[in-house]
Amino acid sequence: KQSFKRIVEWTREAIDKQFVQVIPLLEQNDVLVAANTEFAATGIAAYCKKPFVRTSFAPFLPGEKMPPPAFPYPKPNPIITPKLLWLMMNRVSNYMVKDTINKNRRKYGLAPISNFGEDAAKNSDNFLLYSRYLGHTDPVWDKRFRWNIGGDCFNDTFEYDEEAYQELMAFIKKEQTPVLFFTLGSCTSNDRERFCGMLARICKRKQYRLVVGSGWAKTGETLQGNEQLFLMQKPIPHHLIFPHCDAVIHHGGSGTTHSVARAGKPQLITPLLLDQPYWGYRVQVLGVGPERVKIAKVSESELEQKMGDLISNPEYKKNAAMLSEQIESEKGIENICNYIESLAR
């Protein structure tokens, strides 16, 4: 309860600051580009009379096909329908931000809004930064919103330590046994070491090799070193690693999910928050990996079964290869740049 209260207070303070700080900047430029979590952006763009490109890394547009991506149970339910869940999400967002937004809108001579979720989506140019082949779209969007979808904006210019990369590649290439990569990305979990311990023991039994992306949280730091384990302590870009792995187990962030899909590898997701359960569900629906597991609850025997399926199931490999070709055909960075430039003309 206290954590939620702090989040609400921080969000409201951020909205006040954004109106003050961003308006002078936008007045000197042509287009505002901001994430869907920048709650003040629609009002700022309206005041400056400038186009607003509202981006998101998951389908955060109200619809009738799927629940909100932040909802922890992403499979559509015939009783608790997606439409009902979107209404519930809008109530929460209205409680958090509507009064603060309207206070600032009145200050700048703008009409108040009645529903933040609908107002933000309807008064923006919505650009979805995920693959149409990996995420979903909803037919009702065409009737309600201005929207486009361009694919993931992969960052292949990420700087890395060449020596660390060569050390990793030497580990991967020294044997022919399957290689699993595990990462929690920029997230963490109180159960990360328990989960890493299970991964290491299972890999030892099955003669897999395990690479753990340690990250800022130092995931895997308690693991005992052995010839089947590589603890990656320096950041190395995913596009240089994943093509050399047999499968990836990860937290389900949009970027990591897309990177594994682009590499054409099966994946198993251990979602922690926000849209991660959604991407875990999509991985299962598309047949590029098994049903997601909860890092805090999965047993070692269940995880071992999932890992064996992940490595050996030929359908995952076939579907992942097909998905890779589709994602490779998208030009995410080029698409959003062209879209922004079209609005700035």
Label each PLM-derived region with a short phrase.
Residues Y130-A247:
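Donor-nucleotide binding loops and adjacent catalytic segments primarily
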Residues E13-K83, Y133-L134:
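Conserved nucleotide-sugar donor-interacting segment of glycosyltransferase catalytic cores
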Residues A34-N36, L184, H250-H251:
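Short His-Asn-centered micro-motif
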Residues A35, T55-A58, L129, I149-G150, ...:
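Generic beta-sheet signal
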Residues L25, P68, T81-Y130, K173-K174, ...:
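Nucleotide-activated sugar donor-binding and catalytic core shared by glycosyltransferases
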Residues K1-R6, T81:
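Conserved nucleotide-sugar phosphate-binding/catalytic loop shared by glycosyltransferases and other
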Residues L32-V33, V53, F181, V211, ...:
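Structural detector of well-ordered beta-strand residues that form the stable sheet scaffold
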Residues C48-P51, Y208, K265:
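A short helix->loop->beta-strand "cap" motif at the edges of active sites that frequently abuts
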